[in-house]
Each structure stands twice: as structure tokens, then as C-alpha cells.
């Protein structure tokens, strides 16, 4: 391995065998376990200076992800409250359906008027301007008790929320929806569930797991009890999917109100760059970001005024959330984004719009009403670019109108118009996981066809010949009515050139996919190395000095050492147009989006076969003497270089 430079890619290849999970597991005992450590909200926050003990705490918590869910504990008091709230919602909808079925139009109309009146009465407007002063930093309070903000600042006066009246509730009978609503109840203790066991499988050997399979397990955890195959066959890129649970603690380890306050204190976040303050009132969407650092008094001041808070790239500050994203990116083979949204009661932060991502809305705290609409035009289905804001008058009937409570998940495809409003007595904290942005066939063709054209032009003189002199006089919109023979002949000639020279070969497609995979390597989050993996990688290596002052490393490779890639998608082997061979990887990427230039190693072409074998062998180990290189010294050299860059892991620790 010669040159080490900064510049991005990795789509794995190989046999992805089903492995046991190192990340997701709750053991087979359905009773809630007693953890050996105490984990507070602050333990779940990312800190550049965490010591090994804290890192181990976080790792242990991640492996116990299912032990605090429906599958391990059964309904709690808060679960019963959430279930009661859902029952009330259901009864309200049944009543509305009965009104419609009985043709009781007057009664149904009265219910709608009462709903609008209640919402309007609670949507009081503050006339004073937004301020960063301490006089506006209090939480929303009712009769002196904090209702929306768990961080009560008693020394400050109460503030009233700016709110946006939500659209009137539609009769469910009038909503023709293709949405499948899955309502989930927590499994009872002692109930043997094969799916639950599959998700809860633990292993004492995480260094032998398959990272793609681990990603599938996290997807399974998010959408449980829906099977992943069923989800991708009937919902993915097709229609929305709602999973409702009775366990409000299902996602509590990802983030909390208190964690956000700690993030604001511990990290230097800037408005606009890291955090947005938004509001949607009277049909107008505004971003109220001041300049400078987003300090807690300023942020909570905006929140107490009824503004929504959006934390961008939340995985950079939350270790547990980053673990989820790094595992998911192995499954989806693309960047996994995570934004956090905090909305006070009776408020709306964003206008109706659609996005260019597949969205998983994870409700962590509180409740929020979501309204989804079909894409306005056929061209907006599976949109490649996010839309602007829509007026309420531009929207048709919603395909779904449901309230998400803590523990619920809502998936919808890109191009789905959506808006969300909090209820009068409930704040909302949710995370949106975004995947598959710019991952369409169109993106592949945008990369592929310029490459194909360039190669064809270099090979064929026919494409380099000049256009006929009369081309501008017979072709163009103004000349469509000119049905002369020379016009038709020129059109046919262009079509023949395209058919003959611009059909991509298999090699062309491989090259284009490699270029797209480079982009993933640049955007991906760096992997989180588990403790059992650390002792098998360069991250656990230590060096010292002998009596003469010479550096002594605590590792040494030989032909019998067994190695494999750290992750299935940890690197991408790319042959560049100039013929150079590079290994792009994301081991050293920053936590912020594309913080650094892409990382790569440039290698000799004859060494590429060794890397290809490591890719195809994953998730299995192979000995260094199996690498297809001529000499033993060259085999050890290649393996050592890859290991020292954090790309390989040994089967056994050196110590």
C-alpha cells in the first residue's frame, strides 16, 4: 500500500449470511432485567472526551435495546395512560362514523364546529416580538405547573404559546385511504413469540456478526411486528405505514427533552447551521433563527413562545441514536439522516410539504397529529427534490389523519405531502430518520450516461462529425410543422447514433455504481467499534519503547493470522478513469455531514485482487496466506496496511 490521501465509496459484495446480533437483544427471559450499570440521560449523549467506562455503558445499553420495550416489560402505568388516550381517539372516530352512517349531518357538523372552536380558543396570539431575553425563557405553564417543558425554570415568568389552529378533523368515513394501519399491543409476559425471539437474539461474539444483517434487525425493531420482507413488498416506496404501540418508553433511549438541554449546554451549536427555530401561523411559515450560538435561554425562550425546535444531524450529539444510524446505513447502503423536532402544545412548526427522502417518524415523547396527502401530481410521486410550502387550500383529502403517541412509528415515501400539529395539552418530541435520498435509477443514469457518451465519442468518429449546415433551419420547436424529408432523415440519424453508440455495457454500469458508492463513503457516519471489536482492531493497539528507545508495537501479523473486513460496507474498491486503483472508506469520517474531504488509499492494481477476495469473503474470516498475491511478504504487507487504517479486524485479539 503506497499513497494515503483524502478523497470517497463502498458497496460491499459477498455472501451476507444470517448472523446472530451483537446490537439488538434482550435475552430470552421476558422479565425486565436488572442492568449492572446505571445509565442516565447524560450517559446517552455523545462526548468527545468520554472515558472507556462510559463507552462501555453505552455499548451495554445498546445490546439491551429490547429489554426496555414492550417485549420485555409488559404494560406500565404510562402505557395504560397512552392506551386510554388511543381508546378515546378511537371512540371519537367511531362516533363520527356513526353520525355519517345515520345521515345525522347536523350533529356531525356541530362536532366539527366545536372542534374548530376549541382549537381557535386555545390559539391565542402574542403581539410582542420574539426576544432572546431571559424574560421569555420560561416553559409553558398552566396554573403554575409545567405542562410542556420538563425543564421548569421557576424564577422566570410563564409564557403563552403561539399556536396555529389545525385544520378541522375530517370524518374518517369520508377519507378513502390506501394506508395500512397496524395497531400493536405489548406481548404479554410468558408469551412465546418467534419473531420476538429472532429480534432478541444475543451473541457473545459480535466480531462474527454480519453488519448488513444487524441493520436488518434494527429495521425490524423499528417497524415491529411487521416483517421486513412484508414491509418492503407492500409499503416501501408505495404507501404510508403506521405502527401504534402501547409502550411509550419504546424509543426513550434515543433522546429526551432533558438530553436536548444537555446538548445545548455541552456543545457549541449555532442557529441555522445546527439548529432551526420555526413557526407556522395563519398559513405562514417562518424561520426565526438569530445569529450566533444556540444557548439554552435563547432556545427555550423561542420554545415558550410557541416555536418548534429542529436539531439537525442529531446523531452527532447522541451516541445511542448514532449507533442506530450507523447500523442502518449498512442495511440501506446509503447515508441515514436523523433530525429531531420538538414542538410545544397547540403548535405547528412547518407548512404542508413533501420531502425527497423515505421517512421514518419515530415518536419519542408526547403526542402529535399527522395528516398525509397523496402527491399533488404524478411527477411528484417518489420525488427527487423536496417541495416548497403548500397552502391549506391546495390540499385534498388526507389519506391518513392520525395522532402519534410515544412509541409509535409512521413511515411514508418521498413525495408524500404531510403536516403535523400538536394537541392543546401535549408537547411532541420526535425523530425523523431519513434514507434513500438521491438513490434512484435516475441518479445512476445521471452518473452513467455522461461516462458512456465520453467513451463513445473517443471511440467513434461518427459522433465527432459536424451537424449538417441546415440543422438549425429544419429542427427546433418553431420547425415542427415542417414535415420535409431532410428533417425526418436528420431525426432518424440522431436516433440511430444513440441506439448504436450509447447503450451502456456491463462494465460501464459497474463503473457508474462505483462512483455512486464513493459518494456514500464520503457521507457515511464513521463506524462505532464495540469493545469486543476494539481489541481486534487498530483502535485497541498500543505501542511502547524498549530499553534502547525503539518503538515496539503490541501486534504482529503472519500468514496464519485470520482477518476480515470491519463492516460489509466499510470500503469501496474503485478503478478511476485515469487507471489508478483506490480504496475509499469512511473509518475516519467526521460526525458532521461531509466534514472532511473523502478518504482513500491508492494501491497498485495487482493488489486489488486481495481486496476483492476480502470483500467477497465477508462476513467470514480468511487467513492472510489465502490472499491471491505472489509472495508471503506482500500478503502480510497488504493485510497490515488495511488493518492499520482500521479496515480489517482479526479473529483473535493480539493480547
Curated annotation (Swiss-Prot):
Compositionally biased tracts (Low complexity): 76-86
GO cellular component terms given for this protein: nucleolus; nucleus
Requisite cofactors: Fe(2+)
Domain JmjC: 307-452
Main location per the UniProt record: nucleus
Residue numbers carrying Phosphoserine: 131, 138
Biased amino acid composition, Basic and acidic residues: 87-96, 194-210
Catalytic activity: N(6),N(6)-dimethyl-L-lysyl(36)-[histone H3] + 2 2-oxoglutarate + 2 O2 = L-lysyl(36)-[histone H3] + 2 formaldehyde + 2 succinate + 2 CO2
Record region (Disordered): 1-48, 67-122, 185-210
Keywords, alphabetical: Chromatin regulator, Dioxygenase, Iron, Metal-binding, Nucleus, Oxidoreductase, Phosphoprotein, Repressor, Transcription, Transcription regulation
Enzyme Commission designation: 1.14.11.-, 1.14.11.27
GO terms of molecular function: 2-oxoglutarate-dependent dioxygenase activity; histone H3K36 demethylase activity; histone H3K36me/H3K36me2 demethylase activity; histone H3K4me/H3K4me2/H3K4me3 demethylase activity; iron ion binding
Name of the top EC class for this enzyme: oxidoreductase
Family matches, as PROSITE patterns: JMJC
Binding site for Fe cation: 353, 355, 418
InterPro entries: JmjC_dom, NO66-like, RIOX1/NO66-like_C_WH
Modification type Phosphothreonine: residues: 137
Protein function: Oxygenase that can act as both a histone lysine demethylase and a ribosomal histidine hydroxylase. Specifically demethylates 'Lys-4' (H3K4me) and 'Lys-36' (H3K36me) of histone H3, thereby playing a central role in histone code.
Name by which UniProt lists this protein: Bifunctional lysine-specific demethylase and histidyl-hydroxylase NO66
Originating species: Drosophila sechellia
Amino acid at each position: 500500500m503506497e499513497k494515503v490521501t483524502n478523497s470517497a465509496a463502498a458497496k460491499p459484495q459477498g455472501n451476507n449470511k444470517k448472523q446472530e446480533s451483537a446490537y439488538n437483544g434482550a435475552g430470552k427471559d421476558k422479565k425486565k432485567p436488572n442492568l449492572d450499570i446505571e445509565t442516565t440521560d447524560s450517559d446517552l449523549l455523545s462526548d468527545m472526551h468520554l472515558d472507556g467506562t462510559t463507552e462501555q455503558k453505552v455499548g451495554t445499553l445498546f445490546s439491551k435495546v429490547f429489554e426496555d420495550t414492550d417485549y420485555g416489560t409488559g404494560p406500565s402505568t404510562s402505557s395504560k395512560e397512552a392506551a386510554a388516550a388511543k381508546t378515546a381517539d378511537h371512540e371519537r372516530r367511531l362516533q363520527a362514523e356513526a353520525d355519517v352512517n345515520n345521515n345525522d349531518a347536523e350533529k356531525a357538523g356541530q362536532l366539527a364546529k366545536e372542534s374548530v372552536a376549541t382549537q381557535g380558543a386555545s390559539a391565542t396570539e402574542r403581539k410582542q416580538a420574539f426576544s432572546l431575553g431571559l424574560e421569555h425563557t420560561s416553559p409553558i405553564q398552566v396554573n403554575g405547573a409545567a405542562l410542556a417543558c420538563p425543564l421548569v425554570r421557576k424564577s422566570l415568568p410563564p409564557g403563552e404559546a403561539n399556536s396555529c389552529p389545525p385544520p378541522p378533523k375530517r370524518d374518517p368515513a369520508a377519507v378513502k385511504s390506501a394506508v395500512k394501519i397496524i395497531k400493536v399491543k405489548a406481548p404479554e409476559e410468558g408469551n412465546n413469540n418467534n419473531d420476538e425471539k429472532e429480534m432478541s437474539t444475543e451473541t457473545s461474539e459480535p466480531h462474527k456478526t454480519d453488519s448488513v444483517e444487524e441493520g436488518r434487525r434494527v429495521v425490524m425493531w423499528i417497524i415491529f411486528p411487521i416483517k421486513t420482507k412484508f414491509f418492503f413488498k407492500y409499503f416501501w416506496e408505495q404507501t404510508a405505514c403506521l405502527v401504534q404501540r402501547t409502550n411509550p418508553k419504546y424509543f426513550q433511549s434515543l433522546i429526551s427533552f432533558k438530553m436536548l438541554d444537555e446538548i445545548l449546554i455541552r456543545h457549541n451549536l449555532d442557529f441555522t447551521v445546527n439548529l432551526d427555530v420555526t413557526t407556522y401561523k395563519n398559513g405562514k411559515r417562518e424561520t426565526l433563527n438569530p445569529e450566533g450560538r444556540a444557548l439554552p435561554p435563547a432556545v427555550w425562550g423561542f420554545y415558550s413562545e410557541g416555536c418548534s425546535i429542529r436539531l439537525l444531524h442529531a446523531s452527532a450529539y447522541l451516541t445511542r441514536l448514532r449507533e442506530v444510524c450507523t447500523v442502518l446505513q449498512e442495511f440501506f447502503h446509503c447515508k441515514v439522516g436523523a433530525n429531531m423536532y420538538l414542538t410545544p402544545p397547540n403548535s405547528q412548526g412547518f407548512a404542508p410539504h413533501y420531502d425527497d427522502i423515505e421517512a421514518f417518524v419515530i415518536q419519542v415523547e408526547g403526542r402529535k397529529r399527522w395528516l398525509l396527502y397523496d402527491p399533488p401530481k404524478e411527477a411528484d410521486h417518489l420525488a427527487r427534490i423536496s417541495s416548497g410550502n403548500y397552502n391549506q387550500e391546495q390540499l385534498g383529502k388526507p389519506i391518513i389523519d392520525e395522532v402519534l403517541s410515544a412509541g409509535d412509528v409512521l413511515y411514508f415515501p418521498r413525495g408524500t405531502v404531510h403536516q403535523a400539529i400538536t394537541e392543546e395539552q401535549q408537547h411532541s418530541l420526535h425523530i425523523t430518520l431519513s434514507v434513500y435520498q438521491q438513490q434512484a435509477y435516475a441518479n445512476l443514469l445521471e452518473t452513467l450516461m455522461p461516462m458512456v457518451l465520453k467513451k463513445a465519442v473517443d471511440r467513434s468518429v461518427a459522433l465527432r462529425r459536424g451537424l449538417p449546415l441546415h440543422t438549425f433551419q429544419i429542427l427546433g420547436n418553431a420547425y415542427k410543422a415542417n414535415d420535409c424529408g431532410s428533417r425526418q432523415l436528420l431525426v432518424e440519424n440522431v436516433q440511430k447514433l444513440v441506439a448504436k453508440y450509447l447503450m451502456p455495457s456491463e462494465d460501464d454500469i459497474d463503473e457508474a455504481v462505483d462512483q455512486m458508492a464513493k459518494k456514500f463513503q464520503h457521507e457515511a457516519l464513521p463506524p462505532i467499534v464495540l469493545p469486543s471489536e476494539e481489541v481486534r482492531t487498530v483502535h485497541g493497539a498500543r505501542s511502547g519503547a524498549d530499553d534502547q528507545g525503539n518503538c515496539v508495537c503490541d501486534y504482529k501479523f503472519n500468514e496464519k493470522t485470520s482477518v476480515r473486513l470491519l463492516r460489509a460496507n466499510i470500503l469501496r474498491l474503485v478503478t478511476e478513469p485515469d487507471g489508478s486503483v483506490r480504496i475509499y472508506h469512511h473509518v475516519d469520517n467526521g460526525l458532521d455531514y461531509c466534514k472532511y474531504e473523502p478518504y482513500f488509499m491508492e494501491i497498485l492494481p495487482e493488489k486489488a485482487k486481495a481486496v476483492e477476495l476480502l470483500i467477497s469473503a465477508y462476513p467470514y474470516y480468511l487467513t492472510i496466506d489465502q490472499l491471491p498475491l505472489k509472495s508471503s511478504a506482500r500478503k502480510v504487507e497488504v493485510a497490515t496496511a488495511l488493518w492499520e487504517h482500521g479496515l480489517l479486524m482479526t479473529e483473535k485479539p493480539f493480547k
